Amino acid sequence: MMKVRLFGLIVALGLVIPPARADWPTSRGNAQRTGNVDGQPGPKSPKILWVQESTDHYVSAPSPGKGMIYAPALGTLNSGVLSALSTDPAAGAKRVLWSKSQPFLKLPTVCSPAVVGDTIIFGDGMHQNESPMLYCLDAAKGTAIWQMSIPGPLIHLEGTPTVIDGNAYFGAGNGGVMAIDTRKVTLDGKDMAAGDVEKIIATKWKELQEKYEADKKKDPDFAIPPSEDALPKPAPKLLWQQGGQGKWHVDCPVVAAGDTILAGSAHLDAENSGDRALFCLNRADGSIKWRADLKLNPWAGPSVGGDTVLVGCSSIRFDPKEIPGAKGEIVALNLADGSVKWRKDVAGGVVSPVAISADGLAIYTATDKKVYAVDAKTGAPKWTYTAKAPFFGGVAIAGDTVYAADLNGVLHALALADGKLQWKLDVGSKTKALGNIYASPVVDGGRLYIGTCNIDSQEARKTVIVCVGEK
């Protein structure tokens, strides 16, 4: 009765209840890879609201959370960095809420986190790295909840995990596809709930801090600050693994569709490792439902819209030197059995996922400087937009606008209906931080977020993460 009266009072006063904060449980936020989950349109008349300067390389997209974004980056000597940045335009010098780097992060980090509830999940390692870690952190404080070591050659965690019903699914390079239970962990041989182990870690951290304060009083010159390496390291429960030991090589993010997981496996020519195909797996046990052979490596990974699976493929990865002569392909498959609906050659590599709009447009970028829109079911062309530079990053779709960022650091806002240019914004010139954009834009709360990098420069140059809002 009290709840009914309270609701009636809210209605009578005309109060607005804000919607619950949407999770970001997979790459680009959803299976359609739109880079937007709250349904709010992005900026129509752009203005840079804030800039976070750095020398780290933001080669991957940030993931939005509650009042913050989580930005992976490559630091000095390719060290891993993950920072939580306040999205408040007035944050100023207090923009960085917390940050993780060495020695906590052991390897380079290009994995955009999955954000689910009060936690974030991401991995480290890239390219030739091996034996990475999968991490689960408290989203607000950045404290570790659990960690999972995955030993082996050519094993690395580049793609955002997909988290659904408490389980996380992810590609692990030569480790194939893995599934874990994020809610159950093992510590000192004992099984326990992840929530219970947080209390144990917090208690231990308090003890370490108290010891440090006591040591400082005795002899401040020899007091050693507490390290997270001294904390307990619970590990999540492995549910299943498929395609490991180099049978598959899965770097791109996997995607969930109903009771299935879709994963793109590449073939590494130099290492003669991996099977070039798209696999559809049973989410419960990892068994294979079907496979579809591919002509080119599926570096962009799969997207799902209705009963259609779209895979972006490329002859190259994220290497500007290989852009001349790059080839690409978009393949559309039936979700039920993997049969080909249509396939389309692209005059450039497609290295970021296809985004699928609510009205059935498949939109993708390529290294031939173009943004393409086709009918997702038939492949029939709808429109094409040409920029002055190649694209590595994919698009974000928010409202009736498509957002894309080219390698020269220029943001393009296009009309979803016909691809006509609405506005352009040169991030480098506006921020005096000339650089490249490898990542795909993210739109959250009506604002757009994107980072730059100078990974191909011989000099240390300023990089930025920018927030673009309405004038």
Positions of predicted regions on the chain:
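Bacterial N-terminal signal peptides that target proteins for export
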Residues: M1-G8
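A structural motif specific to WD40 beta-propellers
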Residues: L49, A93-L97, T143-Q147, D188, ...
